[in-house]
Design a protein with these regions (language model features):
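Cross-family detector of peptidyl-prolyl cis-trans isomerase
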Residues: 1-132
C-alpha cells in the first residue's frame, strides 16, 4: 500500500467556541494549524473533515466527523458553497483552518433546509485530510 504524496492525516473533531459580537461582512480565514502537505488549488480533488456552526446560535448544524467520513470534492468548481471554494485555496494537507463565511458566500437569504436559516453567517473548522 503506497502512501499519497499529499499524506494522510490523523486528527480529532474540533470544538468551536461561541463567537459573540457582530459577524464579519467578508470572508475571514484563520489557519489554526498549517499543514505540511500539498496545497489546495482550483481543480484539486480533496477530502476534508469539517464542523459547521451557525454564528447566531453557536449551534453545530453539520459535521463530517459525525458521519466518520470526510467530504470529497473538487475545489473551485462550485461543488460546495463559495466560501469553501475561496476559503480552502492555499490550504495545505494536514492543516486545520477556521473559515467564517458571510451569507453572500454561504447559503444567502434562502438558507439550507431547516438546519441553516436565511442570512446566516457560518463558521467552519476544516481539516484538509488528502488531496490530488
Amino acid at each position: 500500500m503506497s502512501q499519497s504524496p499529499f499524506g494522510n492525516v490523523e486528527k480529532a473533531k474540533p470544538e468551536i467556541d461561541f463567537p459573540g459580537d457582530n459577524p464579519p461582512s467578508e470572508l475571514v480565514i484563520e489557519d489554526l494549524e498549517v499543514g505540511k502537505g500539498a496545497e489546495a488549488s482550483a481543480g484539486a480533488q480533496i477530502s476534508a473533515h469539517y464542523v459547521g456552526v451557525a454564528w447566531s446560535t453557536g449551534e453545530e448544524f453539520d459535521a463530517s466527523w459525525n458521519r466518520g467520513e470526510p467530504l470529497a470534492f473538487t475545489v473551485g468548481v462550485g461543488q460546495v458553497i463559495q466560501g469553501w471554494d475561496q476559503g480552502l485555496l492555499g490550504m495545505k494537507v494536514g492543516g486545520r483552518r477556521k473559515i467564517v463565511i458571510p451569507p453572500h458566500l454561504g447559503y444567502g437569504d434562502r438558507g439550507a433546509g431547516g438546519a441553516i436559516k436565511g442570512g446566516e453567517t457560518l463558521i467552519f473548522v476544516v481539516d484538509l485530510m488528502d488531496g490530488r
